[in-house]
């Protein structure tokens, strides 16, 4: 019997797969537990439509990511921080702070986990921050850390 898997079943199939399984296994286990349903022409076309929509969504997300990488590559971000003696910062600049500052200055939302620092930022100066969108796509921004004005 051909079934369409509604959920992942280890060793049998993943969600959306259409596979041939034993009739008894399908009728007694998969279908009653709502892990699969019999594969009919309507179900097959519905699954194909869902997969096509998912592919379009992934392609659109990839295109947006590439556009964002192009826009941010080489961007200059200025960050003001409180300092103590000898231009040392109170604490350090984290990826959370950098991501918030990028969003504030450019309007582009970046996940803090995508930011890579060569070293912790504990002093004033210019730093290069890598934004790794995926294994093949990355951008570099220039981060200028300056002293906050005391008022």
Curated annotation (Swiss-Prot):
PROSITE patterns: RIBOSOMAL_L9 (PS00651)
Gene3D superfamilies hit by this protein: Ribosomal protein L9, C-terminal domain, Ribosomal protein L9, N-terminal domain
UniProt keyword Ribonucleoprotein, yes or no: yes
GO cellular component, one term: ribosome
A GO biological process held by the record: translation
Entry keyword set: Ribonucleoprotein, Ribosomal protein, RNA-binding, rRNA-binding
One GO molecular-function entry: rRNA binding
Protein function: Binds to the 23S rRNA.
HAMAP family reported for this sequence: Ribosomal_bL9
PANTHER family according to UniProt: 50S RIBOSOMAL PROTEIN L9
Family that this chain belongs to: Belongs to the bacterial ribosomal protein bL9 family.
Name of the featured protein: Large ribosomal subunit protein bL9
Name of the gene: rplI
């Amino acid at each position: 019997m051909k079934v369409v898997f509604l959920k992942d079943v280890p060793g049998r199939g993943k969600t959306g797969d259409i596979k041939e399984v034993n009739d008894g296994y399908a009728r007694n286990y998969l279908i009653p537990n709502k892990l699969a349903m019999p594969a009919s022409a309507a179900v097959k076309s519905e699954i194909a439509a869902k997969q096509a929509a998912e592919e379009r969504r992934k392609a659109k997300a990839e295109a947006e990511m590439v556009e964002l990488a192009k826009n941010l590559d080489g961007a200059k971000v200025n960050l003001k921080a409180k300092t103590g003696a000898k231009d040392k910062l109170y604490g350090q600049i984290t990826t959370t702070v950098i991501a918030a500052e990028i969003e504030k200055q450019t309007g582009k939302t970046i996940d803090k986990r995508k930011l890579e620092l060569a070293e912790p930022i504990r002093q004033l100066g210019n730093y290069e921050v890598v934004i790794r969108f995926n294994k093949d796509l990355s951008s570099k921004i220039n981060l200028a850390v300056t002293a906050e004005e005391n008022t």
